[in-house]
């Protein structure tokens, strides 16, 4: 079975939940193709980049024409089927052609499943799976179903009608999706975020009575929605009250410089360390040596 996983950007090294999914599917014998942009943090031989345009208007126009001609020669029936599906959804012809270009790299492949790893990546790709006679599924994660629809009302209306199956990381997110129109007749699977409890269990229960310095730990992507800046603000209050503590933050992401600035502004340079990305085997010792694990919610 051939599965296409659709990303906006390929998973970073800290997005272990996605990397583990890819690895697990391949271990079970599935043929996995990745569609996205950016750099892949781990080697994967089957990656396909989203179409990109460069140069002035004339150059971009030529690029679009060449891509569409190649697609029409390679997959004429799927291409016309896609346009027909778009038009039946009320999409203007010019926008249907734009979407055909946007999805040309997916339509040109033969897939059994098209899975959108983040819900919002399905926008303008609602008809891709049906056009290539594949089944469509998606994952419900926090931002894409809790915040994105608030900014883009009705964005998933067409999506729900074309889904074969839904994966959610919680019952709450699934309930939120139903408020936005997901019907109960679409099969859904709840797979909660988890860890290997056998690997991360302590070999022996150490004395966890607090020492002179309280040791905090967070393992997280450095992203605004993880609330790390609020965590730093809370810890600064502890420092003002005279508590001694250290705080290790493991992970990488786009907010590193902003968080470093916040650390400096809050006078936490001696207390807070940004460890960066670590492999799982190197994270275990941090858990064992910490007193309290912090997770913003």
Model-flagged regions — what are they?
Residues 260-281:
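Nucleotide-activated donor-binding/catalytic signature segment of Leloir-type glycosyltransferases, i.e.
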Residues 1-55, 109, 134, 288:
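N-terminal subdomain of nucleotide-sugar transferases
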Residues 36, 138-141, 153-202:
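Donor nucleotide-sugar binding/catalytic pocket of nucleotide-sugar-dependent glycosyltransferases
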Residues 116-122:
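Short His-centered aromatic/hydrophobic patch
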Residues 167, 204-226, 232-237, 248, ...:
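Conserved donor-binding/catalytic core segment of Leloir-type glycosyltransferases
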Residues 100-109, 131, 135, 143-166:
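Membrane-proximal helix-turn-helix segments that form the acceptor-binding/catalytic region
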Residues 277-278, 285-290:
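Short alpha-helical donor nucleotide-sugar binding micro-motif in glycosyltransferases
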Residues 9-10, 219-224, 253, 278:
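Short donor-sugar binding/catalytic loops of nucleotide-sugar-dependent glycosyltransferases
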């Amino acid at each position: 079975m051939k599965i296409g996983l659709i990303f906006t950007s390929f998973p970073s090294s800290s997005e272990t939940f996605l990397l583990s999914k890819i690895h697990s599917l391949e271990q079970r014998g599935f043929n996995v193709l990745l569609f996205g942009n950016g750099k892949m943090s781990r080697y994967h031989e089957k990656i396909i980049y989203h179409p990109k345009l460069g140069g002035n208007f004339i150059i971009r126009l030529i690029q679009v024409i060449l891509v569409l001609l190649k697609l029409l020669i390679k997959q004429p029936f799927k291409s016309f089927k896609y346009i027909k599906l778009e038009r039946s959804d009320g999409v203007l012809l010019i926008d249907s052609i734009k979407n055909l270009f946007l999805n040309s790299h997916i339509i040109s492949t033969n897939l059994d499943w098209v899975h959108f790893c983040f819900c919002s990546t399905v926008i303008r790709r609602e008809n891709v799976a049906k056009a290539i006679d594949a089944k469509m599924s998606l994952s419900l994660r926090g931002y894409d179903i809790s915040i994105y629809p608030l900014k883009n009302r009705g964005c998933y209306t067409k999506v729900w009608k074309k889904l074969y199956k839904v994966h959610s990381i919680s019952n709450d997110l699934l309930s939120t999706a139903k408020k936005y129109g997901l019907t109960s007749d679409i099969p859904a699977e709840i797979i909660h975020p988890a860890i290997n409890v056998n690997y991360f269990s302590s070999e022996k229960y150490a004395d966890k009575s607090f020492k002179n310095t309280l040791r905090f730990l967070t393992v997280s992507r450095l992203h605004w929605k993880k609330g790390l800046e609020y965590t730093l603000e809370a810890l600064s209050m502890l420092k003002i009250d005279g508590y001694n503590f250290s705080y290790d933050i493991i992970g990488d992401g786009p907010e590193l410089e902003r968080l470093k600035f916040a650390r400096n502004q809050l006078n936490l340079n001696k207390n807070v360390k940004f460890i960066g990305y670590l492999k799982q085997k190197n994270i275990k010792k941090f858990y064992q040596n910490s007193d309290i694990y912090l997770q913003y919610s």
